[in-house]
């Protein structure tokens, strides 16, 4: 029997675990165990699923173990996934059956593709990508590792999104052109509902229509 663990028993974990449960049943039948892994909630049950600590998950005597990280914070997601990979646990990609992934598309390990997501042709997506409900990635896009698309985020064609970027709910990224893509830099944050019409430097937060850098108020002394 194999053991499958969803790291993070919070909101996205609770949304994701039934998708994985359905996926495993279709692929493997009924001979498996599926749990949450969450050190804060260990020993409890969440939505009917047992919650294990990380240590208990790693020590559990199963034939094979698989995992995914349903934690929205990209830095925590990266830290957890890198740690668990060091223990030889295999990441599993989770894909809802009504999502659409076109041919000639490459998606890295550990992705979560939620309901009503579309990923178009000739796209390349890195590891542990989160595509939340009703988001889409259009043709010829390059998406890095640990990128998050919140619900309804829309990325049009010929866009490069670098590692650890966050695309907020309802945000729209304008298409680039061949050999001159629009670029969202590493760690950039695109705010909810933003309309991005030009490249965004690494580490910058933008919001509005058209999207502009969000300036911090001066700290009072």
Swiss-Prot record:
Keywords for the protein's UniProt record, in alphabetical order:
Acyltransferase, Lipopolysaccharide biosynthesis, Transferase
Please provide, alphabetically and separated by semicolons, the GO molecular function terms listed in this UniProt record. acyltransferase activity
Q: Which Pfam families match?
A: Hexapep_2 (PF14602), PglD_N (PF17836)
Q: In which pathway does it act?
A: Bacterial outer membrane biogenesis; LPS O-antigen biosynthesis
Keyword Methyltransferase annotated:
no
Please name the GO terms of the biological process aspect recorded for this protein, alphabetically. O antigen biosynthetic process
For this protein, what is the EC number? 2.3.1.227
- Gene3D superfamilies per the UniProt record, alphabetical: 3.40.50.20, Hexapeptide repeat proteins (2.160.10.10)
Kindly give the InterPro entries that the UniProt entry links to this protein.
Answer: AcTrfase_PglD-like (IPR020019), Hexapep (IPR001451), PglD_N (IPR041561), Trans_hexapeptide_repeat (IPR050179), Trimer_LpxA-like_sf (IPR011004)
Q: Which PANTHER family match?
A: ACETYLTRANSFERASE (PTHR43300), UDP-N-ACETYLBACILLOSAMINE N-ACETYLTRANSFERASE (PTHR43300:SF7)
In UniProt terms, what function does this protein have?
A: Catalyzes the transfer of an acetyl residue from acetyl-CoA onto GDP-perosamine to form GDP-N-acetyl-perosamine.
The protein's name in its UniProt record? GDP-perosamine N-acetyltransferase
Species of origin reads Escherichia coli O157:H7
